[in-house]
Amino acid sequence: MTTKSKNAINLSDSAKVDEQSVQPFTRSQKVYVQGSRPDIRVPMREITLDVTPTDFGGEINAPVTVYDTSGPYTDPNVVIDVRKGLGDVRSAWIDDRGDTERLPGLSSNFGQERLADPELTKLRFAHVNNPRRAKAGANVSQMHYARKGIITAEMEYVAIRENMKLQEARAAGLLKQQHAGHSFGASIPKEITPEFVREEIARGRAIIPANINHVELEPMIIGRNFLVKINGNIGNSALGSSIEEEVAKLTWGIRWGSDTVMDLSTGKHIHETREWIIRNSPVPIGTVPIYQALEKVNGVAEDLTWELFRDTLIEQAEQGVDYFTIHAGVLLRYVPLTAKRVTGIVSRGGSIMAKWCLAHHKENFLYTHFDEICEIMKAYDVSFSLGDGLRPGSIADANDEAQFGELETLGELTKIAWKHDVQCMIEGPGHVPMQLIKENMDKQLECCDEAPFYTLGPLTTDIAPGYDHITSGIGAAMIGWFGCAMLCYVTPKEHLGLPNKDDVKTGIITYKIAAHAADLAKGHPGAQIRDNALSKARFEFRWEDQFNLGLDPDTARSYHDETLPKDSAKVAHFCSMCGPKFCSMKITQEVREYAANQRIDAVDVDVAQGLAEQAERFKKEGSQLYKKV
């Protein structure tokens, strides 16, 4: 069915969930950890493991708990209907605080116009509540509560989520070894507590993006002293894509581990698309409001006004957008600094504001109206993601005067946001060679006083179109280790075209690898549990456990099947690369058995003799490739 024919039918009648996104992972189950009140139920994924084969000791292996961003979609006990949206997680928490009110209807002019247009009925999400807003004079941001000494339900929720049943894992022996990390000055505790979360938010070192109108949200935290997070981008464009396809991209992305999702739609029906996305999203949704504002003036940047932009902010805040990218650091005086660059201004939002500044020869209205923007943000608890509109678009332009000038301005704006108790993170590059990455991180920590850093990569070289998920994954792992709090994924299609589902998955898995590698290097508590469990499964030839413990079980299983497709290969005591005679792990096990039988320490074994004897034994037993387990 074409996009056009889909839109001819009411989406509220026809929309369906992407079936691939709602399949539970093999040997995994959704578990919920109870908080201090019955409605704090924190979801995690528990991976059940096989018993160690008798040849290797026959021990029971405890299940491994992993962070889960997939929301109710992978819970077989939940009925998913994208036409109705996800269940309500947060309304009771918000009601109990008593500082918000229901509005009689939408406040934004544009929202009212869309609601009154009968032509949009077929596209409109059918179950929309009137929005909330802070009561007059109130501030409903998580930072405001934190600075008042209040531990909110959201703070407790993320503390439980970050720990991932760490105490149980330690008791089960899943963390017998974890290398000490080097955190470059971060203050990572041995256990994440609700009070620690509150302190980090009050300090501005972390944010919980959680708009009061996004009640379907499962809260998460972004900060250098927590697990490194990743963001995935979706959104339609003038080239096409339906609302249903964008919801499918959302559910597919969070299945594979996207901690937040940015809707970067620039095509038709941006307002309606966003409503469907938010109502079906368990993760924070971010936007770049200037994109929609530009659509409202038919793409003519010079026609943008503060009044129109303000209306756009209110429109999106009342829908439930959790964080806004605001390019308020693109100042008139910085624009000429980009003239000698190889790639000029590559940020879409940055180029829009630069064009407006030059056309009017006035200062950026996002900068001059920043206090007014803060007033809107704290009325809905929308977090800032201060955009790097002058980020380098090539390694030749990295760390130049324009980039760092804007960064200093973003530091200034961060302090203004904090005066309003508005949560804030900072966006970063971009394209940066490896030797310059740490300077970026250090400069951001200095200028922005440790506000969370959120970077696009960075890409470490410009010579690999089609492989920029790899060029950027290298930089992402490095900057994550140095202190970056969230990494924006890059797909293989970067610079080339619009990503499809496979590209989205590839980008997310690449960035999950980078984020996890950074967590290991920083020494985040419990980060090595999954590595240890998978390594043990690999050594014991528990093939299914190896697949299921991996970030992408489907691909791992398919690769193994290409070489050894039969079920019997899943219990083989050798790997698919080396075969039975050259498998180092099989040989090591046999050397250990020899040492145990001889009652001597394995390190004292005559390795050559051991290998020779075991090779002879293998031949005498008929060179059997498989053993019953």
Swiss-Prot record:
Pathway(s) it belongs to: Cofactor biosynthesis; thiamine diphosphate biosynthesis
Cofactor notes: Binds 1 [4Fe-4S] cluster per subunit. The cluster is coordinated with 3 cysteines and an exchangeable S-adenosyl-L-methionine.
One CC-aspect GO term: cytosol
Keyword Cell inner membrane among record annotations: no
Residues bound to substrate: 233, 262, 291, 327, 347-349, 388-391, 427, 454
Zinc found in the keyword field: yes
Annotated stretches, region: Disordered: 1-22
Cofactor(s) the protein requires to work: [4Fe-4S] cluster
One Gene Ontology molecular-function label: 4 iron, 4 sulfur cluster binding
Function: Catalyzes the synthesis of the hydroxymethylpyrimidine phosphate (HMP-P) moiety of thiamine from aminoimidazole ribotide (AIR) in a radical S-adenosyl-L-methionine (SAM)-dependent reaction.
UniProt protein name: Phosphomethylpyrimidine synthase
Species the sequence originates in: Pseudomonas fluorescens (strain Pf0-1)
Record gene name: thiC
